[in-house]
Amino acid sequence: MNIYSTSVDTLTTERPPKVSMFSVWPPLAIEIDMWAEGGISDARVNVMKRVQGPKTSILARWNDHPAGVGFAAVHGKNAFVHAVEIRSTQRQQGVASWLMKQAAFWAAEQGASRLNVACTNANVAANALYRSIGMKVVGGYHYRMKG
């Protein structure tokens, strides 16, 4: 698992296009559906709902359709992004980059100065995305799952 971090200033130089990214809490039904499509279980969504402090879902709209979803929460000066899912038909169009920028703007509005995200080593596309938007690996961990 890679843990990426960057200053919110790195990602707040250009706002996402109008009516493309929405910070919403509680999450809309379409967001929960997109999380489910991406393998994010109800149990994980329930963990997001229990988070204390500032939190938001981010709904991405692209080509006039729901395109992706993510979750962000702030603790102190750190914002953490989780559960980023982009619909397969909307990938390779910059949606995830804009979603991360929206997360950074939202985080800055909450007083955060850092944006962080964890990503499995196996997720080549997401690792490339986070590097391409200026995030740096600041740590990592390995875990085993019984199965």
Language-model-derived ranges and their functions:
Residues 86, 92-105, 109, 128-132:
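Conserved acetyl-CoA-binding loop-helix of GNAT-fold acetyltransferases
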Residues 46-87:
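A conserved beta-strand-loop-helix scaffold within acyl/acetyltransferase catalytic domains
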Residues 77, 113, 136:
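Short acidic/polar active-site loop segments enriched in Thr and Asp
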Residues 1-29, 144-145:
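Acyl-donor-binding surface of acyltransferase catalytic domains
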Residues 117-127, 144-147:
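Conserved beta-strand-loop-alpha-helix junction that forms the acyl-donor binding cleft
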Residues 24-26, 34-43:
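Helix-loop element at the rim of GNAT/NAT acetyltransferase active sites that forms part
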